[in-house]
Amino acid sequence: MSHVDDGFRSLTLKRFPQTDDVNPLLAWEAADEYLLQQLDETEIRGPVLILNDTFGALSCALAEHSPYSIGDSYLSELGTRENLRHNGIAESSVTFLNSTADYPQAPGVVLIKVPKTLALLEQQLRALRKVVTAQTRIIAGAKARDIHTSTLELFEKVLGPTTTTLAWKKARLINCTFSHPQLADAPQTLSWKLEDTGWTIHNHANVFSRTGLDIGARFFMQHLPENLDGEIVDLGCGNGVIGLSLLAKNPQANVVFVDESPMAVDSSRLNVETNLPEAFERCEFMINNALSGVEPFRFNAVFCNPPFHQKHALTDNIAWEMFHHARRCLKINGELYIVANRHLDYFHKLKKIFGNCATIATNNKFVILKAVKQGHRR
């Protein structure tokens, strides 16, 4: 938990999920403060759009202006809602929209936290292009090291004239004025053929490894089990290639695709529809914080390629939460399979949670682990 006085109001903010007290990560950064410093409240005429507000620092500070919080992270929405409540601000003050939704017309102010991927930034800038005017104040912010020439060129190409500020507390801002430059249309998804399958994999802008199969998933797919039945989960599904493979290998199983990214879940749904339409009725698609709210003892198996970062921050909190949720939701003798970089040492974490862990396969970079939910552990 951390305190910030941004000039609009004094706030107490926390990350979601919370980090441990030994290695705490802040729920806000200098770029949030810098954005708010540059914003004169007298300029706010018309809707306020906030993009990629990781834990609600901007939304909480500007709550009295009824902002729209736009992004592709259910975790960020949950974190923002929790911080609104914690600071005594009505959740209804903020309207939450997915990045692929229609944005409000003629906004007075647009604040953008520059996302990690240029593809997501381009998708969002193209969406803004349809609604902003020459009078819209457009300001983006990030750590100075995360603003590159390619970032500025993208703003110029999609929206118009772009300038940057001096660095402050290692943060930098981008100011942009909409001038309606000529711009060719772009497809909503990026597609590629998955070798040895005949499948075409479709990827929305914010999907991990959207330009091709990542090497961890490739290794995982080589060792997925067969002859499973009942309900199984592709947890943190991304574009759904693991779940697709499980559907093909296990015709008696139903697969639940889960991710905190709406774009990932939409990509998974599209990939089942286009590649295995006959298996679509065996699928469920869920935008969720891991398996929050899912009943215990439901699944026969969970498959997971856990992230070790949240936006720009390195953290194993999300993976840790995924493992605990998986154990709670597995049936007795249900199995959790994960693939991970070897250096993360998830073997001992799983053994601590499940009381057991076995190595299924390993190579010079990745390891595939299996843990079984045993009846004698609660």
UniProtKB/Swiss-Prot annotation:
EC assignment: 2.1.1.174
Family classification: Belongs to the methyltransferase superfamily. RlmG family.
Superkingdom, taxonomy of origin: Bacteria
GO cellular component: cytoplasm
Protein name as annotated: Ribosomal RNA large subunit methyltransferase G
CDD domains tied to this protein: AdoMet_MTases
Naturally occurring in which organism (per UniProt): Salmonella gallinarum (strain 287/91 / NCTC 13346)
An MF annotation (GO) of this entry: nucleic acid binding
Reaction equation(s) it catalyzes: guanosine(1835) in 23S rRNA + S-adenosyl-L-methionine = N(2)-methylguanosine(1835) in 23S rRNA + S-adenosyl-L-homocysteine + H(+)
Role of this protein: Specifically methylates the guanine in position 1835 (m2G1835) of 23S rRNA.
Subcellular location: Cytoplasm
